[in-house]
C-alpha cells in the first residue's frame, strides 16, 4: 500500500519543575537553599531516511509525544532532560501545520534533521533566586508547558515516466 499523506498530532515534552529544598547537614541546622533546576522537555525531530518509501508507518501512529523533563532535586541536582522523539520520514517529505496551512519544513536528504517542536525549558530551583536580601527563598519556577500541534506530512513524487 502506498501512502503519500499523513496527518498526526505531535506534542513536545513539558519542562520539569525547579525544586524548593534547603541544605541539611549535621552540625549545620540552617543551611541555605540548594534546590536544583528542572530538566528540559524532549524535542520532536524529523529525520530523513532513505529506507522509508511511504508514510505508511505514520498512518497508524496518530499521536507522537516526547518525554517530559524530570523535576529538580535537593543538593542542587538537576532534573533529567526528556528523551527526544525522532520521526523517520522518507526523503522528499514536506511538513505543514494542519490548522493554518503554514509550511514548516522540507526533508530532502538522508540523515537531514529538523527540529519540528522544541520541548519546554525546565524551571529554576530556589538556589537561583538567592539574593543578599532574600537568602532563603521558598519558591521555585515551574517548568514551561509543552507545545501541541497537528502536522500534515506530504510525500512529493517525481515521475520518471509520464
Specify the residue positions occupied by each region the protein language model found.
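Conserved P-loop NTPase architecture
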Residues: 1-161
Amino acid at each position: 500500500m502506498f501512502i503519500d499523506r499523513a496527518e498526526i498530532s505531535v506534542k513536545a515534552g513539558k519542562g520539569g519543575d525547579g525544586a524548593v529544598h534547603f541544605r541539611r547537614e549535621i552540625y549545620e541546622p540552617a543551611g541555605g537553599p540548594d534546590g536544583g533546576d528542572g530538566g528540559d522537555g524532549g524535542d520532536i525531530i524529523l529525520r530523513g531516511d532513505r529506507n522509508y518509501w511511504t508514510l505508511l508507518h505514520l498512518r497508524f501512529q496518530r499521536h507522537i509525544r516526547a518525554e517530559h523533563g524530570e523535576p529538580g532535586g535537593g543538593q542542587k541536582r538537576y532534573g533529567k532532560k526528556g528523551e527526544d522523539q525522532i520521526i523517520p520520514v522518507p526523503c522528499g517529505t514536506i511538513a505543514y501545520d494542519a490548522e493554518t496551512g503554514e509550511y514548516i519544513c522540507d526533508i530532502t536528504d538522508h540523515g537531514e534533521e529538523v527540529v519540528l517542536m522544541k520541548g519546554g525549558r525546565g524551571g529554576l530551583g530556589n538556589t537561583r533566586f538567592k539574593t543578599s536580601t532574600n537568602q532563603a527563598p521558598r519558591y521555585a519556577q515551574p517548568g514551561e508547558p509543552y507545545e501541541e500541534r497537528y502536522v500534515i506530512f506530504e510525500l512529493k513524487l517525481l515521475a520518471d515516466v509520464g
